[in-house]
Amino acid sequence: MARIAGVNIPTAKRVVIALTYIHGIGPKFAQEIVAKVGIPAERRVHQLTDAEVLQIREAIDRDYQVEGDLRRDTAMNIKRLMDLGCYRGLRHRRGLPVRGQRTHTNARTRKGPAKAIAGKKK
């Protein structure tokens, strides 16, 4: 298994697909990286030479924010909103939907399981 950006990527898959296992790299960025490095898109990970893996690793380190750095930045952005006390920060703090979705019904994923109300029957 090749290890890129702290992630063991699967060896049997094509390089473009395998790169998407890294947090922060989707299909579009994976194709960009492969094109920059000059590797054929249909090549599998186990067919890559050590030099090609090193080129991919350097391209990702140089041009993209991935894995821990990306997760930390996302968490810091949310924390900043919460510290500001703006509407989005309050919604994050209360564990409610942030982007204007309705909460009267639905929003169960964000709010968690429904709480039983004593004495309420159909």
UniProtKB/Swiss-Prot annotation:
Cellular component annotations (GO), alphabetically ordered: cytosol; small ribosomal subunit
Keyword Cell division on entry: no
UniProt keyword annotations, A-Z: Ribonucleoprotein, Ribosomal protein, RNA-binding, rRNA-binding, tRNA-binding
Gene3D superfamilies to which the protein is assigned, alphabetical: 1.10.8.50, 30s ribosomal protein s13, domain 2
MF terms (GO), sorted A to Z: rRNA binding; structural constituent of ribosome; tRNA binding
GO BP annotation list: translation
Zinc among keywords: no
Annotated region described as Disordered, given as residue ranges: 99-122
Domain of life: Bacteria
UniProt similarity note: Belongs to the universal ribosomal protein uS13 family.
Record note on quaternary structure: Part of the 30S ribosomal subunit. Forms a loose heterodimer with protein S19. Forms two bridges to the 50S subunit in the 70S ribosome.
Function: Located at the top of the head of the 30S subunit, it contacts several helices of the 16S rRNA. In the 70S ribosome it contacts the 23S rRNA (bridge B1a) and protein L5 of the 50S subunit (bridge B1b), connecting the 2 subunits; these bridges are implicated in subunit movement. Contacts the tRNAs in the A and P-sites.
Name of the protein in question: Small ribosomal subunit protein uS13
Gene: rpsM
